[in-house]
Amino acid sequence: MRVSPLSFGASSLGGVFHSIDENRAIEALHVAVEGGMNFIDVSPYYGHYKAEIVLGKALRTVPRDKYYLSTKVGRYGKDGVNTWDYSAQRAVDSVYESMERLGVDYIDLINVHDIEFADLHQIAGETLPALVELREKGVVGHVGITDLQIENLVWVVNHVPEGTVETILNFCHFCLCDDKLCDWLDYFEQRGIGIINASPLSMGLLSERGVPSWHPAPQPLVEACSRAAQHCKAKG
């Protein structure tokens, strides 16, 4: 895949950070694609399926060859309750369910979502082999893993056959307040694994908007970043 330097993270379409106007959300996706963004990342977990549903509506008028689509398996939710299921069967079922919500007949990149919530042995021995089988059938194009903890990503890469994991997605570790991912760039690149740097603004930490209550940053850092944002605004 030849992806644009900036991609469209569709978690916001699920109202993850704040409530959304669906029409404006759809317009935002269209503007992004028209502006050259060709990689879209989503998950059934975002908004408990809402993000995929809204994204599916937005993609109805976008030619399929204009974008690469990435979604995930493992994390879900219903009626405000978060759930996790990294079993092979649930992973396979989830892929087909996502395709239906998104209105597509294949997924360019399928990720195992936030592997820290699973037994890593299950990820390596059950979840990923199921997704690799879908890759071999042409249902998905590529297979990846995501997590906040870089060490978990490395562990899985070290415990699966070469070529199993084609991409990793890590968030909040390659931004102004945290550059831990830099220490691992060579490791992944030497293994031919693509790197997706998610949340370059640290999920709102480095913005005027501020962070939601569930943000993992310690309160002193939240307050320091808020002061920094106010300082930058004051300086124009």
Please name every model-derived segment.
Residues M1-F17, S70-T83, L109-N111, G204-E208:
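N-terminal small/glycine-rich loop or linker at the start of catalytic domains
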Residues M1-Y67:
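N-terminal binding-site loop/beta-alpha segment at the start of enzyme catalytic domains
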Residues F8, A25, A32, I40, ...:
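Conserved, mostly hydrophobic/aromatic
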Residues S11-N23, G77-V92, E116-Q122, H215:
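Active-site mouth loops of central-metabolism enzymes
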